[in-house]
Amino acid sequence: MRKVKLSIFFLTLLFLVGCSSSKFIPENEYLLQEVEIKSDQKGFDAASLEPYIRQKANSKWFSLFNIPLGTYSLSGRDTTKWVNRTLRKIGEEPVLFDTVQANQSMNDLKKALQNAGYMHAEVDLQTKVKGKKLKAIYTLHPGEPYRINRVRYDIADERIKRILALDKPQHAIRSLQSGSRFTVERLDEERNRITKLLLDSGFYKFHKDFIVFEADSARNNTDINLVVRLLKYRANSDAPETNHPRYFIRDVKFSSSEESGIHLRPKILEYNTAIKAGEPFSAAHLQATYNNFARLQAVRYTNIKFKELPDTTLLDCDIQLSHNKPHTLSFQPEGTNTAGDLGAAVSLTYENRNLFRGSEVLRVQLRGAFEAITGLEGYNDQDYQEYNAEAKLQFPRLLAPFLSSAFQRRSTASSELSFSYNLQNRPEFHRRVLSAAFRYRWNEPKRYSSYRMDLIDLNYVYMPWISDTFKRDYLDDVSSRNAILRYNYENLLVMKMGFGLRFNNGRHAMIANIETAGNILKGFSKVLSFRKNAQGQYTLFNTAYAQYIKGDFDYTRLITFDTHNSLALHIDLGLAYPYGNSKILPFEKRYFSGGANSVRGWSVRELGPGSFRGTDGRIDFINQTGDMKLDMNIEYRTKLFWKFHGAAFVDAGNIWTLRQYEEQPGGQFKLHEFYKQIAVAYGLGLRLNFDFFILRFDMGMKAINPAYETQREHFAVLHPNSGRDFTFHFAVGMPF
């Protein structure tokens, strides 16, 4: 509580100091305290023109606290002292109102309004002075916008008319439509549209300056009659005007900057080259060829040149390739620390970037780890050893004959085949995991989307040895432990298929995944009469297989207020259902709550399911898992100073089970009760943003704790107890 009071006092002090920065304001000048932009026209979005205002007031933390200015004001005038230099560096110098910049802002606003079709727009500036502080109010008077009445295309070249489909107005006129507002943006869109169509149709020397617009309006009329005129081609100032020449590709050849020549198979070169002999020149095909070779790890860079054949409209294309080193070998030692247990690990990685001369990437990694475990009693061995061997082979294309070559060329795709073997020896048990997978990945950058399809993902878990002490204490049927724990120390086969997509355009981000396991094996089980074990599960090679379906949906909305302040809204939903050959989900497929990316008032795996408190009131990592998850977060983010950013957040959520388990009382999802079991937390965060990575420190407090029924403990926000409710998180990267 004392720390909280000191923090409040410190923030209040800085706030008060921020209000008294007059010592840095010269005579006859004023601190720009606030800038407002508004319009006299109802419904007009004046805020969208705020970027045209050149002077902004000093930034505020969370859009409320003028602490950067207050920090600067704490400094003295003697800049030879390090304390004054430091305060000025982390603070923010007062913004003094500048009439020159204000007038320039008015001109910029007026020009922006005219470009948006408001030809008779005016902008007024009003200033309100109080002491040494000034508020600037920009008032927009847009007036009546000009609108397009009629559009006519003046194009003499019949070939270009056909390409632009001017005989089909519904296809030709897109941005410039009758009744739409007459704006510079629409003119630019139409100019770019025509230019792109022609550059993709063989007009190698065409550029947008050949397109001009002529606008005519009657006196005192806001209707515009627009003419889109295409200028004739002229090779030079002395040459006569002609129709624009249309160029075709005569030949495509490849060359290399290395003496060893080209290291890729001819079929791979052809597959990644969108430029084809006999076809018209296309800027889109040129860019696609650059993109295709850029994603090949065997290629370092690509340079494409075109050569005109004299007195013809033919082009020869030369694609110059420079290759990467085909082989790399790396060795990496590392130190480990798991809950205070120290250890070491080493890894050796070999990579071949051009295995079959098709830019196939083979990556083989060997890793070994050792850790000394303390605090275990009753076990002969006190060491943890892990050895892992993994091989991945990635093809820079989809190995899918059922997909059209056009789709494969259009998508930035790859296929991946992987195998791994993991050996773990712990004092309590020995575990072996054999994995194999084959998956597709492809991107659609224009749609800000990426996709993943797991055709098969196979995991075989084998437990060759479990210590008698561990069996007696945790796994025996007569023990107080449960089926969930026992299930995770049995041999298990998981064969799943899945699909996932990601979308991110900067404002909206979405991740969706669905996977299912065991259905194919279940079909074979019935047809081939697989054996069943004592629990009634079908087995393959005396090992039960898992059967379930799982779906996840994650959505984030980022609302940016200005360069220093933004709001992030986030929701994460997950549901997994075991059925058929499984009554319990595999442990790694179950959900948990709490932690740095969830409800931050709880540590990881400390919350839920439902109102479950854990075994004997203690954290229970096995039982505090569930079959469904809900996370909801709202986080206000603000720039503080230098690389430091701050955040204030409210989190809510929990996990639940779909079935009633005796060992998880209160954990089952019930429609009439689940909303009462939603946990709520609040807190503050500090982030160090180094651009290429972010260090995050979040401090969360419990507000509503569903594990307790008494009002004092359930509504923790009314009776905060830092020892009971406070949780600190350290993480790398943003939470969502």
Residue ranges and their predicted role:
Residues 1-8:
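Bacterial N-terminal signal peptides that target proteins for export
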Residues 2, 20-337, 367, 549-551, ...:
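Periplasmic polypeptide-binding modules associated with outer-membrane biogenesis and secretion
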Residues 15-18:
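C-terminal motif of bacterial Sec signal peptides marking the signal peptidase cleavage site
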Residues 118, 203, 326, 357-359, ...:
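Strand-connecting loop/turn motifs
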Residues 162-163, 282-509, 600-601, 612, ...:
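Gram-negative/organellar outer-membrane beta-barrel architecture
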Residues 293, 350, 393, 512, ...:
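Hydrophobic, well-ordered secondary-structure elements that form the walls
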Residues 331-333, 362-366, 417-419, 510-514, ...:
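Membrane-embedded beta-strand positions of outer-membrane beta-barrel proteins
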Residues 336-339, 452-638, 648-652, 656-671:
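C-terminal outer-membrane beta-barrel translocator/porin domains of Gram-negative envelope proteins
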